[in-house]
Amino acid sequence: MVNAVSRVRRFVRGAPLTYLWLTVLLATTVIQRSVNRHHLHQFLVHDSTNIHDLATDPLAVLFESLLWIDGRSWTPYLVLFTLFLAPAERWLGQRRWLTVGLTAHVGATYLSEGWLYLAIEYRHASQHLVHTTDIGVSYFLVGVIAVLAYRIATPWRWGYLAVLIAIFGWLLIAAEDFTAIGHFSAIFIGLMFYPMARRRSAAVGSRARPDN
């Protein structure tokens, strides 16, 4: 039991940003549960990466949208962060991990909202979606999940990628909304970091190799 607790502590200490972020998300989830629906809507719209706020205060909303989860259940994020974000942080290091995740978050946000903007301009979507609620950590998460493919040896890597693309490809076809476009885009943004992942794998491998 003591050994298990010690291993958990070492794992958490090896991914401090992941678990600090989870702690913040736990706090904001408590806030979501404690306020009424009207005030919650005001909170979330204020921190949303929608077309209006990206045009008026992009840096603030791109950061603040990462502090909320899209839903009221925190436990699934604990599982997903532990399965994907924490191992990626331990492998890539904090700076590279942030680079991948934030690039996916920002890139997928602008791609999805750009698609929505065009849909509104061509009257394929309602004008009120300019102020839609768009918060959450999923683009960051999907981008990091994608780059983790480079941590997996072939041929298993291709199976991992096939499952990932199949899941979000099906959601793209079934949902046909801007968030599905964002998730699908985040996969390929994450995969663009192959050169960085390759260098990191080589560095980790050289440290693990015993001296002759």
PLM-predicted stretches and their roles:
Residues 33-84:
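N-terminal TM1-TM2 helical hairpin plus the immediately adjacent luminal interfacial "cap"
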Residues 2-45:
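N-terminal signal-anchor transmembrane alpha helix
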Residues 61, 79-86, 141-147, 162-172:
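Hydrophobic, membrane-inserted alpha-helices
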Residues 175-190:
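Loop-to-transmembrane alpha-helix initiation sites
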Residues 83-101:
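Membrane-interface helix/loop boundary segments of multi-pass membrane proteins
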Residues 100-107, 157-170, 186, 190:
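Central hydrophobic cores of alpha-helical transmembrane segments
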Residues 127-147, 182:
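Membrane-interface micro-motifs in multi-pass membrane enzymes
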Residues 26-31, 105-114, 163-178:
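Aromatic-anchored segments of alpha-helical transmembrane domains
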